[in-house]
């Protein structure tokens, strides 16, 4: 394995394994993907754990890697899966967990301002209704299924 690939893998492992807190909400295992080097869009996935005794809501996300950053999900409509914007955000139940995963809820990056390659890292700010803002470093992991 080349040294660059080894270092990239180590950085991805380090940054995706370190949990961060926004108030009582813990963000874990964050990573991003793009379909190809020339993709105009990408997505981020992670696990959110609400340690408080009240529901919270992820209401927005922001990053300089894209012109627009939105909260999205997939829905089935007439037998066809479609991606749609979540206008009201994502609820994280009190004491519960919420997975942002492929084929489900996720952070969508549209109009990428730069290419995202395996091992790259960028900042993403998540805004929660009660817990406030948390800025995390997200690693691009194109090998993850």
Give residue ranges: language-model regions.
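Bacterial N-terminal signal peptides that target proteins for export
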Residues: 1-10
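N-terminal signal peptide c-region/cleavage motif recognized by signal peptidases
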Residues: 16-22
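Compact, glycine-rich, soluble single-domain proteins
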Residues: 23-145
């Amino acid at each position: 394995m080349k040294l660059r690939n080894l270092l990239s893998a180590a950085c991805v492992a380090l940054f995706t394994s370190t949990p961060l807190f926004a108030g009582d909400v813990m963000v874990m295992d964050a990573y991003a993907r793009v379909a190809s080097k020339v993709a105009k869009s990408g997505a981020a996935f992670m696990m959110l754990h609400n340690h408080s005794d009240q529901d919270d809501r992820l209401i927005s996300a922001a990053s300089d890697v894209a012109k627009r950053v939105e909260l999205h999900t997939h829905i089935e409509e007439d037998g066809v899966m479609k991606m749609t914007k979540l206008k009201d955000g994502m609820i994280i139940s009190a004491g519960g967990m919420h997975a942002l995963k492929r084929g489900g809820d996720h952070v969508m990056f549209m109009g990428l301002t730069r290419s995202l390659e395996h091992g790259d890292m960028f900042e993403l700010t998540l805004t929660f209704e009660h817990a406030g803002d948390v800025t995390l470093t997200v690693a691009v992991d194109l090998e993850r299924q």
